[in-house]
């Protein structure tokens, strides 16, 4: 699932503060190690990390001393770092709650921040649709079955977007 995450981070978010959601502690440590090898300030944290290590990672990201925090099932909710400009989904999930909460870590407004970039290496968008997609919420539950998500992925820039004849990110025209 890690794939070309370093290359994509360099291309789309170089130097921006980012949080990576990983599959396990070992995976988070591996991804953080790869980022460090590429010259970035990165750490891995998890529920097994000491409270002081988690607090230091949070402060480091807030203050800009860290560029990437790789976490294993830790920062899904309750973390407020408005400066986060990149979310990396490096684990698949059938949970809409996880998906929206993970992306929500980067949706806070901050001075100078113009947008959030989501590097979805796990294909969560194809399971759940775009995070800003209208959803029907109900306390009655819903029927189980395959959910159709209206998403198209540009072959030129890999942007995932609502179906359209032209990619809104790079202008690629899809064949008719």
Q: Where are the language model's segments positioned?
A:
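Alpha-helical elements of the RecA-like P-loop NTPase motor core of helicases
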Residues: 3, 29, 33, 55, ...
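SF2 helicase motor core recognition
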Residues: 68-88, 95, 103-108
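Conserved helicase ATPase core of P-loop NTP-dependent helicases/translocases
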Residues: 19, 27-76
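Conserved interdomain hinge at the start of the Helicase C-terminal
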Residues: 1-34, 142-149
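Residue-level signal for alpha-helix termini/capping positions
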Residues: 10, 14, 36, 62-63, ...
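Short glycine-/polar-rich loops that comprise or flank the Walker A/P-loop
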Residues: 38-41, 82-86, 112-117
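Residues at the C-termini of beta-strands that transition into short coil/loop
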Residues: 46-48, 91, 122
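C-terminal helicase lobe
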Residues: 63, 79, 96-101, 105-176
């Amino acid at each position: 699932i890690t794939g070309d995450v370093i290359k994509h981070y360099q291309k789309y978010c170089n130097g921006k503060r980012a949080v990576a959601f990983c599959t396990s502690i070992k995976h988070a440590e591996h991804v953080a190690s790869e980022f460090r090898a590429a010259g970035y300030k990165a750490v891995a944290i998890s529920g097994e990390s000491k409270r002081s290590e988690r607090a230091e990672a949070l402060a480091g990201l807030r203050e800009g001393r860290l560029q990437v925090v790789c976490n294993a099932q830790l920062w899904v909710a309750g973390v407020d770092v408005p400066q986060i400009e990149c979310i990396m989904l490096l684990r698949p999930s059938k949970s809409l709650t996880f998906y929206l909460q993970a992306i929500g870590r980067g949706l806070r407004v901050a001075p100078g921040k113009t947008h959030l970039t989501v590097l979805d290496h796990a294909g969560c968008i194809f399971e759940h649709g775009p995070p800003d997609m209208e959803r029907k919420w109900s306390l009655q539950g819903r029927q189980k079955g395959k959910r159709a998500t209206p998403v198209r992925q540009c072959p030129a820039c890999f942007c995932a977007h609502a179906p359209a004849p032209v990619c809104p990110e790079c202008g690629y025209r899809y064949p008719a």
